[in-house]
Amino acid sequence: MALKIRLARAGSKKRPYYHVVVADVRAPRDGRFIETVGSWNPVLLKDAERVKLDAERIQHWIAQGAQPTDRVLRFLDQAGIAKRPSRNNPTKGEPGKKAQERLALAKQAEEEAAAKAAEAAAAAAAPAEEAASE
């Protein structure tokens, strides 16, 4: 039986409240669960009562093989119960192929314009030097 430590929604409409529960992965989100090990009230902002966790029971269930979901793992990391590895994906922020092609074309056009401007400046300076030497 695969176990997850996950959130089960409670509360009324537009007033969410979540229980942190240990449940079988096949059970419905708000359905059958094995044990409640905490709660999360997202309505409370920056409050000590916002997230309540039973650290001892959570560690017990993790030792039994229960896997916390990403959101619960964030709570456990903040509480110092479990370590959440950082998700660093530097390639995700890079532009796509088409955008890179457009950037390369724009850079090439800019370099050509700079080269033409340098040639024009050199050509304008050359006749002035010839006139000065005569």
Swiss-Prot record:
Protein transport found in the keyword field: no
Gene Ontology BP terms: translation
GO MF term (any one): structural constituent of ribosome
PANTHER family assigned: 30S RIBOSOMAL PROTEIN S16, SMALL RIBOSOMAL SUBUNIT PROTEIN BS16M
Cellular component GO terms held in the UniProt record: cytoplasm; small ribosomal subunit
Matches recorded under NCBIfam families: S16
Superkingdom of origin: Bacteria
Gene3D superfamilies assigned: 3.30.1320.10
Region (Disordered) location: 79-134
Annotated family: Belongs to the bacterial ribosomal protein bS16 family.
UniProt cross-references to SUPFAM superfamilies, sorted A to Z: Ribosomal protein S16
Species: Brucella suis (strain ATCC 23445 / NCTC 10510)
Residue ranges, compositional bias (Low complexity): 115-134
UniProt-listed InterPro entries: Ribosomal_bS16, Ribosomal_bS16_dom_sf
Transmembrane portions of the chain: none
Keywords: Ribonucleoprotein, Ribosomal protein
Protein's name in the database: Small ribosomal subunit protein bS16
